């Protein structure tokens, strides 16, 4: 997980962002954003969520960008968007795609966004600049236009909010990948409050702490012992450790080398 905090004294706002992948059957990443008024005056602002979607695996990074986007099919819903490209292709041929990519968001009361910008073109404008999108800098609302075959964007605009001094507001973003169609309303119902996010966060911490203790070694070198705890939560490397049990000579040699390295 990752927790990040930023404060802008000139603007008068502080943001705290928690990102993690919760333990459970859902292939999702949660992002909880808490905005606090740290000034001595009322502050009004319009919150946006903006998650660019490539909607392909890393294997497709070097595919023809325009052709890739032409295969994109976007579905706009109450809480966000779902993207399901029609085909996957490379030099060996074409095959149907079954993977769905999605972004959904809500405030801490479970209310969805007022407006959704389903493509980068609609959100960024003609410049295509993700760092200065026209939707934000020129206060543009999304226009009804053809969205299929375009580069997708999980961008959403919430209603204007005014925070008194010391007050805060929270937004939850759910991002995911699935091999079947996902119900965004159900996901928001499951994760769409800070109390629920915090419960899943504590469960996630507990799970990984237990995983890190599955292999407990006291070598006399704290750096080496901590490194082994880290290795313990790496699925591929953990499989390697199980193989080493059948080859103790290799295990002892590696331990000796690493022990010497961490002295």
Model-identified regions with their sequence ranges:
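Short glycine/proline/serine/threonine-rich loop/turn segments at secondary-structure transition edges
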Residues: 181-183
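Extended, loop-rich substrate-binding clefts of extracytoplasmic carbohydrate-active enzymes
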Residues: 1-26, 128-156, 229-232
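Short Pro-Gly-centered flexible turn/kink motifs
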Residues: 43-45, 161-179
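Short beta-strand segments enriched in hydrophobic/aromatic residues
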Residues: 8, 49-51, 175-177
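Hydrophobic alpha-helical scaffolding
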Residues: 90, 149, 164, 194, ...
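Polysaccharide-binding surfaces and accessory modules of carbohydrate-active proteins
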Residues: 4, 18-137, 187-214
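Substrate-binding groove/exosite segments of carbohydrate-active enzymes
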Residues: 150-152, 167, 209-263
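Short, solvent-exposed loop/edge-beta patches enriched in aromatic
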Residues: 11, 38-41, 163-168, 258-263
């Amino acid at each position: 997980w990752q927790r990040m905090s930023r404060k802008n004294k000139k603007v008068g706002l502080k943001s705290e962002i928690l990102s993690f992948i919760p333990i459970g059957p859902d292939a999702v990443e949660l992002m909880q954003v808490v905005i606090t008024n740290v000034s001595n005056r009322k502050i009004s602002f319009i919150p946006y969520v903006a998650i660019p979607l490539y909607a392909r695996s890393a294997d497709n990074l070097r595919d023809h960008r325009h052709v890739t986007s032409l295969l994109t099919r976007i579905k706009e819903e109450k809480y966000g968007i779902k993207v399901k490209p029609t085909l996957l292709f490379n030099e060996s041929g074409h095959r149907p795609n079954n993977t769905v990519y999605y972004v959904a968001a809500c405030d801490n009361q479970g209310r969805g966004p007022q407006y959704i910008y389903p493509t980068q073109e609609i959100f960024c404008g003609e410049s295509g600049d993700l760092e200065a999108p026209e939707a934000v800098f020129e206060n543009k609302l999304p226009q009804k236009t053809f969205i299929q075959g375009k580069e997708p964007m999980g961008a959403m605009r919430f209603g204007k909010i005014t925070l008194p001094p010391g007050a805060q507001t929270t937004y939850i973003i759910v991002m995911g990948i699935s091999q079947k169609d996902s119900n965004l309303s159900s996901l928001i119902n499951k994760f769409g409050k800070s109390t629920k996010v915090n419960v899943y966060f504590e469960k996630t911490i507990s799970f990984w702490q237990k995983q890190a203790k599955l292999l407990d070694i006291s070598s006399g070198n704290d750096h080496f012992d901590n490194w082994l705890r880290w290795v313990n939560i790496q699925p591929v490397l953990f499989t390697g450790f199980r193989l080493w049990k059948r080859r103790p000579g290799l295990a002892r040699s590696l331990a000796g080398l690493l022990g010497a390295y961490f002295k």
